Amino acid sequence: MAKVRELEEAFVQEQPSPQLPSEIAEECCAQLLGKGLLVYPEDSAYLLAETAAGARSSGEKGGDPGLQVGVKSEMQLNNGNFSSEEEDADTQESKTKAADPQLSQKKSITQMMKDKKKQTQLTLQWLEDNYIVCEGVCLPRCILYAHYLDFCRKEKLEPACAATFGKTIRQKFPLLTTRRLGTRGHSKYHYYGIGIKESSAYYHSVYSGKGLTRFSGSKLKNEGGFTRKYSLSSKTGTLLPEFPSAQHLVYQGCISKDKVDTLIMMYKTHCQCILDNAINGNFEEIQHFLLHFWQGMPDHLLPLLENPVIIDIFCVCDSILYKVLTDVLIPATMQEMPESLLADIRNFAKNWEQWVVSSLENLPEALIDKKIPILRRFVSSLKRQTSFLHLAQIARPALFDQHVVNAMVSDIEKVDLNSIGSQALLTISNSTDTESDIYSEHDSITVFQELKDLLKKNATVEAFIEWLDTVVEQRVIKMSKQNGRSLKKRAQDFLLKWSFFGARVMHNLTLNNASSFGSFHLIRMLLDEYILLAMETQFNNDKEQELQNLLDKYMKNSDASKAAFTASPSSCFLANRNKASSLASDTVKNESHVETSYVPLPSSQPGAIPPALHPFSTEDTDNMPLPGQIELSQSTGHLMTPPISPAIASRGSVINQGPMASRPPSVGTVLSAPTHCSTYAEPIYPTLSPANHDFYGTNSNYQTMFRTQSHPASSLYAHRAEHGRCMAWTEQQLSRDFFGGSCAGSPYNCRPPSSYGPSTHTQESHSMQVLNTGSFNFLSNAGAGSCQGSTLPSNSPNGYYGNNINYSEAHRLGSMVNQHVSVISSVRSLPPYSDIHDPLNILDDSSRKQNNSFYADTLSPVACRTTVVASNLQTQIPSSSSQCMYGTSNQYPVQDSLDSNAASNREMVSSLPPINTVFMGTAAGDT
């Protein structure tokens, strides 16, 4: 009690604030003593540490300098900026210094707060130097905290706890959020919206991996016990990275950027289809996509396939596709894979080269010669990784069996490694090769001794992989870099001695009748396979670096080429949806890229076309005057997509759900017509010959707006004025003689043979057929299925096979837009015949079919085009009526009544992609 009284008196005497009453001071002292926060040495000396309001260093006080500080203010305890680890450290430090009077005095609270503020500033600067705001990127929280601990260790700072560090991060990145990602039972918290800068030292450790292969460091992801078998469904929605842009390429010669951009976009869509089918397990359909793309290449794009720059860009795109396919098909976590999936991947790798070679027939040899080596490396890597995973799955149970491991250790202990190392083959040195003895027999003995130690430690497959990474890195890669020797030569020397030493070990096990011979043989096969995989990975990385250098040569901006080549595949769950509005023109391919399209006609025949269409000459297009409000087209070529493959015509995907959802009758199985329409002509699209295997034929001289024919035009229509494609036709009554014959009776001739040169423009003006490019309807579009002579207003419905489905013009994206969707995630069967060709159920109404002539005997010039029968029209169809289909009847209802059925008709046949389709970074509203 005397000691307590003495301390209380000292507290009152040393009170720094005279305004504070002594009663309050005594109460504070009692509280400090009661809470154990007042520490004093055994010699009863005491020195009060000041509070935050009037704190000053203990050295400034007039007391004994040997006395120690023993007060920890409650402000420090209640401050959230200090962690529990710091409190424990401070308490331990106080006790230690109090016990030893010779130690330096403890820092005051003010000094500690200054240090803490300085450390926070250093941490914020470190965050700025190594991390960046990146929308759509997730970073595991544990990895970020591990980086912080490494930073504190290097800077000799006391790290804060994870919660305090989280507050510091949000000071730098206030919009940062957290998400819990991962499979059930193995989910972890991730920071969403932050990524590691490429200039950071942590970038390669996270995104590139520290090891030599994709499986290096995978042991961290297998912690936690039970893991499910790998399934491709977990990769659903994976999108390809961006391909090189045509705008950044440096071309050689005169090449249209629009054509190059179209070709690259087509190829990316093709590659995305391959990726989607691989994820869905439809490996056999990939062959059909290859044939469809390469053999259906439009003629006007074929010359690009001979350009060296385009060929090299294709090689870069192939490398990107192969890396994504490898990441999707084979898990880097060494997760157990079903046997059926392994078999499918092996079969896919076996047939891939044959599929690609067969699809490239009759194409430039330079393209084939460049693509084959890249695909062979991909096939070799795919086979090697599947083989390694298969062996790892078999060896894992053996390594977990303690009895098997003990038997292997016991048997290998009986092998004399020194006698094997002293055999003649390993001691032979080639005098001409001074580097041949670098990997000596001593190294072989050391390596196998390390293997023996791993077995004794009950090492897992992941531990063996980590060990092999170290062996190959230290004894092959590092040595080749230091001595300047070829990596290939060094790898060959290592593999030779590794294989020989392993074979001699197995020889000794055989002679000793080792009971664990089978298990050890399995482990050796696993190690051999991984070493080969590590070597091949290094060689493939060198080849990819060559492709990167090649891309840098062709790209104007090296950063853009690096971003395109090193980008990782993204997921639909991480896609940046906020950029949809700005990227709408990039993700939807506009095949004309302009709002007007013209056809060049001879200047000597300007009067043969309607007055609303202005001919122009092709000789001097730069100085050509503009008639009226019409603008010149900037399109330099006929940019069309390849035709629909007959092999996928029955697939209900977004590729063939648009206005081209029919197959040519001459390829594959032709859709059977119903009995009441047995005389329906076979060619669905009459302008094609039966020999053509695509909708666009093989002529490179066709126009996207006007298609020249060798016969008189058979139909005229008023085009959509709001799109600005052409001026409206004058509303004049055209006689029957204007058409030159029946619109349904006269056959169409085939297009002339293909050629790369410009059109001769020798067709007569009356041999011009106007097509409705707003929608490629083959049966009843406004150009081919509307009544001759009838004038349709600009707001006339442009239905799908006769449907009066009205879509807002904002969603149609112009009359020359063909939307390309990269991800196909919906498959359905082909709709019934009646749903496609007769959605309005016209064929079932016998009253609409009348067996009369195509043209009425009256003077009315209106005759409706039909395939089988015609109607006797006594009255003219008003401009608000729909297009005719198969046959006509009385007047159609007005537009207002048709709009009421738009919703129901849209459900029957829709040209829009399904809702569950994942688009390339665009929202559904952009389609």
UniProtKB/Swiss-Prot annotation:
Tell me a Gene Ontology molecular-function term this record carries: RNA polymerase II transcription regulatory region sequence-specific DNA binding
InterPro entries to which the protein is assigned, alphabetical: DNA-bd_RFX, RFX-like, WH-like_DNA-bd_sf, WH_DNA-bd_sf
Q: Name one GO cellular component term.
A: nucleus
Please provide the record's keywords in A-Z order.
Answer: Developmental protein, Diabetes mellitus, Differentiation, DNA-binding, Nucleus, Transcription, Transcription regulation
Please state where this protein is localized: Nucleus
What is this protein's tissue specificity according to the annotation? In the adult pancreas, expression is restricted to the islets where it could be detected in all endocrine lineages.
Supply the Gene3D superfamilies for this chain. Winged helix-like DNA-binding domain superfamily/Winged helix DNA-binding domain
Tell me what induces its expression: By Neurog3.
Single GO BP term: regulation of insulin secretion
Please list where the region (Disordered) is annotated.
1-21, 81-108
Q: Which residues bind DNA?
A: 123-198
| Classification via PROSITE patterns | RFX_DBD
Keyword flag Protein transport: no
Q: What happens when the gene is disrupted?
A: Mice were born at the expected Mendelian ratio, but fail to feed normally, exhibit gross bowel distension due to small bowel obstruction and die within 2 days post partum. Some, but not all, of the animals also have reduced pancreas size. pancreata had almost no expression of the islet hormones genes, except for PP (polypeptide-producing).
Please describe what this protein does. Transcription factor required to direct islet cell differentiation during endocrine pancreas development. Specifically required for the differentiation of 4 of the 5 islet cell types and for the production of insulin. Not required for pancreatic PP (polypeptide-producing) cells differentiation. Acts downstream of NEUROG3 and regulates the transcription factors involved in beta-cell maturation and function, thereby restricting the expression of the beta-cell differentiation and specification genes, and thus the beta-cell fate choice.
Instruction: State how it assembles.
Output: Interacts with RFX3.
The record's PANTHER family line, in alphabetical order, gives: DNA-BINDING PROTEIN RFX6 (PTHR12619:SF28), RFX TRANSCRIPTION FACTOR FAMILY (PTHR12619)
Q: Which family does it belong to?
A: Belongs to the RFX family.
UniProt-recorded name of the protein:
DNA-binding protein RFX6
User: What organism does the record attribute this protein to?
Assistant: Mus musculus (Mouse)
Instruction: Provide the organism lineage as a comma list.
Output: Eukaryota, Metazoa, Chordata, Craniata, Vertebrata
